[in-house]
Each structure stands twice: as structure tokens, then as C-alpha cells.
Amino acid sequence: MYALTHGRIYTGHEILDDHAIVIANGLIERVCPLAELPPEIEQRSLNGAVISPGFIDVQLNGCGGVQFNDTADAVTVKTLEIMQKANEKSGCTSYLPTLITSSDELMKQGIRVMREYLAKHPNQALGLHLEGPWLNMVKKGTHNPDYVRKPDAELVDYMCANADVITKVTLAPEMTGTDVISKLAAAGIVVSAGHSNATLKEAKAGFRAGIT
């Protein structure tokens, strides 16, 4: 057991000075005023550093010199490990690896890799973010137009069956219809609107169906 001292602590609710973080068995046991520390506990000074909960990046295509969605060879556990190490240098402890519009085969590979990574490294990546392929072509941005398409039942069912490793799907609601949105949301996937040219009516229908 030891205490981290002489840092400014941001809890998410308040800013604490003259406090310590007590660590026991690798976990935070408590946060307390310095004056309440047991006299015998080891103190490790942080020399005025800022202490806060780790940041979470909910859309990360690549970092650390790698891209998760470049080629099939890049969609690997090793790529995700490199991204995790790069994230930690700037205080980002968790993230959603993001695979942009691609073929069914590459999406399924990404899902398999995500499952393998989560089994090997729990509590780092928080699941896969599939950005596309059900986007509006006029708002595709840098997404490959060859793979921008409307949903098919087989892929939707596959995604729902693997919802335990797919955290988020970004889609254009006017391209999918409400049934697909409802099905994904019911499976526990966060559905986000993006790369969309929806009318107000189409957008409202999408939000009612489960877009958050």
C-alpha cells in the first residue's frame, strides 16, 4: 500500500488539493486529505502533477504511426496494441477503435480482431466503432465510395450477433430506415447519426428508432 501525494486531483465533480490517493493491490482504495494518511504509509510525490480519470476517445481510426483501417494487414491485434500505447502517453486510457466504410469481409475481420483483443487486453479498448458503410454518398467525406452501400439483412444480423464487441455504429438514418436502427439498438449497440443528409423528418424518425 502507498499514497500518491502532492498532485492536483480532478475527480469529475471537484478539484482537490492537499489530498492523497491511496493505492492498495493495484487499485485505488480511497482519496483522503493528506492529514488523514497513516504515518507509516509510503508516500510517492507527484511533484504537482495533474491527476484525473483517463480520457476516452470514441472515434479513433489510428495513431502512433498506424491506421486500423488502411488494409486487411493493418486490422490486427498488434495495430490496436500500438494505438493503446500511443493513447496512454496523452492520458487516454480507453478508446473505440474505428473501422471506416469497408467490405463485409474487412468488417467481419475487424470484429474478430476486436474480440481477440478484448480477450487479451480487457479494460483498454471499449469495443469496436463501425463508421459506415451505410452512409449518404453526398456526405461520404474520405470514405471509399465503392463500399458505401445500403444495409443487407445478413450483415445486420451478423453485427447484432456480435454486439458484445461492437459498441457503436455510425450511419445515415435516411439510408437505413428505422427497422435497422431499431434492431441495432435493441441488440445493445449505440447508434450514431453521421455522414448524413437527412431531412428533419428523416432525422426525427431515426432518433425515435434508437439513434442516441
Tell me what each language-model feature is:
Residues 1-37:
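N-terminal metal-binding scaffold of metallo-dependent hydrolase/deaminase domains
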Residues 7, 21, 26, 48, ...:
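Divalent metal-coordination and catalytic microenvironments
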Residues 39-42, 46-49, 110-122, 204-208:
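Short amphipathic alpha-helices and their capping/turn segments at secondary-structure boundaries
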Residues 61-63, 81-110, 123-136, 163-174, ...:
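Divalent metal-dependent hydrolysis catalytic cores, especially in the metallo-beta-lactamase
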Residues 61-66, 73-76, 85-96, 137-163, ...:
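Active-site gating loops and adjacent loop-to-helix segments of metal-dependent hydrolytic enzymes
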Residues 80-84, 108-115, 156, 181, ...:
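Generic structural signal for well-ordered alpha-helices
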Residues 119, 149-212:
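Histidine/acidic residue-rich metal-binding segments in metalloenzymes
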